[in-house]
Amino acid sequence: RVLFRSGAGTWICVCGSGDGMKLVTLTQAKPFNEICTEIDRLIGNDYQRVKIPVTSSATSLRKRVLSKFSKLEALRGTSGAAYLNSRGIFSLPAEAIRFNARQRHNGSVFQSLYSLATDDKGELCYLHQTLLDGDKKADIGSSAKRLKSLQEDNYLDHARSVAIRMFPVASTLGIAEGIETALSAHQIYNVNTWATINSGFMKKFRVPAGVLHLIIFADRDENSATGLAAACECAHANLMAKNDLQRVSVYWPDHDDFNNMLMNGDQVRELVFHKKKAVA
């Protein structure tokens, strides 16, 4: 029996009592949110419902990495700088790399070079870590270098110019694969040099606006030619692309890479390519 009191649809029955909303909920056997949606539609409150996006694990990790990076100390005066010094590197990066004094790994605590790799849109794509034990690479039975994805795979598959941008962009810009190689090239040639991390990212690197001369510091890779192949593919793509480039130089040592050259000395070879001028 419905009791017309207070306009709330009050009712009473042998099974209980309540207001109108409770009656509808009991008789329709539907979740409360579905009932509210149907009632809204019946009385004309039909509006667009916007779903709040679920934060992805990559987004969450990216925020944590950026927050941590902002709290880390600069390299100078740390065992991270001492490690680079032991590799002959005294010209330290201006940006993108900091020192983490407590880097956990497999239940142990190390230190690390904590490096951020971004793409040509400025989006953070990867966290690169070099695990250290004092002023030496950590002896963990495998590579002391770690690369962690900070974007979804469907974004990373199409990301271009991923690099650890350790120095400001300049009209003459260098790229190399590894951090130590890039810092060695910077120290030897006084060229702002970025680390593309590996040969795959080097192939996809395209110069930003304003770069007139790209210098690619290639690894020798005597048994595979991987470094030189990536350097030449990068050079070709940049020469064919629409940009401000005037020339591309490819440098490589007779052995190993430019950090080995810095420490032990070596001969360096060079190829120079000039961009074809557009016909007016």
Residue ranges of predicted features:
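Phosphate-handling DNA/RNA-contact segment within nucleic-acid enzymes
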Residues: H105-A209
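Terminal peptide-recognition signature
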Residues: L3, C13, V24, L84, ...
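Short, basic/aromatic recognition patches
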Residues: I89-S108
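Short, solvent-exposed polar/charged micro-motifs at secondary-structure junctions
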Residues: R1, Y47, Q103-S108, K137-A138, ...
